[in-house]
Structures are given as C-alpha cells and as structure tokens.
Amino acid sequence: MYAVVKTGGKQYKVSEGDFLKVEKLEGAVGDTVEFSEILMVGGDKVVIGTPLVPSASVVGKIVEQGKDKKILVFKSKRRKNTRKLNGHRQLRTILMIEKINA
C-alpha cells in the first residue's frame, strides 16, 4: 500500500517502512507525526482525492533533525568586478513512515 502525502509545499509518494526527507517539522527525535493531507491512496484499490482523501492519514516517526548539504549562491555583475558568494543550509527532518490509514 502506498500514499501521496503533501507537506512543506511538496508531494511525496510513501509506503510503510520508507525513510522520507522533508522540510523542517517541529518535534524531537522519536516523536510521531501525523499527516492528514493525503492526495491519493493506492494498493488493491486506488482512491484519488478531490483534492484530499477523507479520513486518510499517514503516521511517521522523526528519526533525525538536521541540515541539508550546503548550497552556494553566486551573484555577479558583468564588467563591474562585483561578485557575491553566499552559502545556505536548509533545515530538514528525516522521517520513517510507520502506518498508512486509509
């Protein structure tokens, strides 16, 4: 069984036992998180939401809180010898999907 979950402005296809890297979620390591915005549930019978599937949810456990790899942002203006280099590390949460309720 699988589901399509919407979180952090993005959509993820998940199954039970999957590890999922998403935008930062509040909570400590070991806490459970429940997603109620389920767009689709699949398995023997596929249910597509309009826009959400009613009474469906996905439960996951927070495995790790941390930062992603560094992204370098380089800006320059031509012929002016003006350069700017910035680095950015996005906060992220790693989840383990425990249960899909459909």
UniProtKB/Swiss-Prot annotation:
Keywords: Ribonucleoprotein, Ribosomal protein, RNA-binding, rRNA-binding. The keyword Lipid metabolism does not apply. GO terms for molecular function: rRNA binding; structural constituent of ribosome. One of its GO terms (cellular component) is cytoplasm. One of its GO terms (biological process) is translation. The keyword Ribosomal protein applies. It comes from the Bacteria. Part of the 50S ribosomal subunit. Contacts protein L20. This protein binds to 23S rRNA in the presence of protein L20. Belongs to the bacterial ribosomal protein bL21 family. This is Large ribosomal subunit protein bL21. The gene is rplU.
